[in-house]
Amino acid sequence: MRRSTLYSLIFIIILTAFAVWVDLPGSRNVFGRQAEVVEGLDLQGGLQVLLQARHVGGKAPTREQMEEVRQVVEQRVNSLGLTEPVVQLQGSDRIVVELPGVKDPEQAIRTFQGTGLLEFIDAGDTPLQVGTLVNTTLGPAITNGNQNQNSTKNGTPTPGTTPTPESTPQANQTPVAANVTPTPEDPQFQQALQATPPEQLQRTYTTVITGNDIANARPDFDPTTGEPVVSFELKPEAAKKFADFTTQNVGKYLAIALDKKIISSPQIRDPITNGRGVITGVTREEARTLAIQIRSGSLSVPLDIISSNTVGATLGNDSVQRSIRAGLIGIGAVALFMILYYRLPGFVSVVALAIYAAVVFALFKLIPVTLTLAGIAGFILSVGMAVDANVLIFARLKDELRRGRGLIQAIDVGFKNAWPSIRDSNISTLITCAILIWFGSRFGASVIKGFAITLAIGVIVSMFTAIFVTRTLLQVVLSMVHTRNLWIWGIGKNQLPEPEGRTLQPAKSSRTTQA
């Protein structure tokens, strides 16, 4: 065995052992990061929601606005603590949200759908009724844009609140149900509209600070009562502004509005100078939702739900089992064909194929790649393409053996002649994968993107295993199997080369016939 072949074999053994270790069930700590299987929506179950931006004032949102909204939605979704959520733009005014493994779909929808515009407004000498609508200096409660749009029916429970530090008496508020994106077609909006005095809608209230002025917000518990609250801390500039306002308006009312609906209207008993406060009267889930909305910022464009689809985990597990079964049957059939047709090289290709599968699956866990049914299909297709590369190599190998070359020379020449075809076909496939990945990212087609990513990874690894692993294994086998019987190399008796000296060659004349 040549020294280079020995070194290559050692490298393959180490690589295979590492890949198998990563592939073992469970999570592995590799280079400071966790390597684990990330299942997509269709495998572990979850929620898929299609959101559409509302055309306010009859104007469609710009691309920059949609990207800003997508980033805010992504921040809110990431705060849910889910594994590999997907938030993608689809077309010019839609956003696709995929939440694998979400436990409470309704709570998740409330988290990212609401605009989350939190306003602290000057209510003056009269408290505003909880659950009513207000016009503020940041915009009216009713616009032409939301009058012409259909509303979703998913309401957001909205809490009563008290924007006071611990020293300030808390107002006694009752939580009310408030739609996060109220529109006139929504029954909850109609209820809030009917409860709103007409003179209140004719007035514009001054917004003192907004949720964007809050530096941090978190769900918490009142140390005295043990009730859930949202604790917040204002940014330095806003804290000074808030302190000046509360100092000048002691005895008056400061209302809090979420998406133009009043959720609290406490009286200012003392100046609030420390820039800290709490929002009370919330449930545990409502506190979490409101804190996420405050931290991520408000949406510049309201969003409506076009469709939502919940995938059960049972369906996902059944799909996984069927996909694995189909893949094993397909790989087994291919392995049997390779061994029967190519014999010893076919057996070597099966070993290389097993190494290929181990390396690819390890990469899926290390990157990580979110596995979906389409992604599994892409992986199975890449297995077929890996076998196709071996078929090309072995066909060239048999051609060289038929021409009477020795085994070592036939292997070298066979791989050299097969490489251009393997390279060109795989590059064409990778270009197609790049187009599919772009298409999936641009139009929110995560299924297509997942298929293309797994296929591309498989194709890249297949070029390595076909050229490097298979060639090394063949050279190792050749050094161990000392036989001149070409049958085990896939050459039948009727395909053997003619014995040397038995072939007829045309005679070459060195003389020139002259007329």
Swiss-Prot record:
Description of how the protein assembles with itself and partners: Forms a complex with SecF. Part of the essential Sec protein translocation apparatus which comprises SecA, SecYEG and auxiliary proteins SecDF. Other proteins may also be involved.
One GO term (biological process): intracellular protein transmembrane transport
Lipid bilayer topology: Multi-pass membrane protein
GO molecular-function terms, A-Z: protein-transporting ATPase activity
Assigned GO CC terms: plasma membrane
Disordered: annotated span: 141-186
Main location: membrane
Protein name: Protein translocase subunit SecD
Pfam family, one: SecD_SecF_C
Subcellular compartments: Cell membrane
Ranges of Polar residues composition bias in the record: 170-186
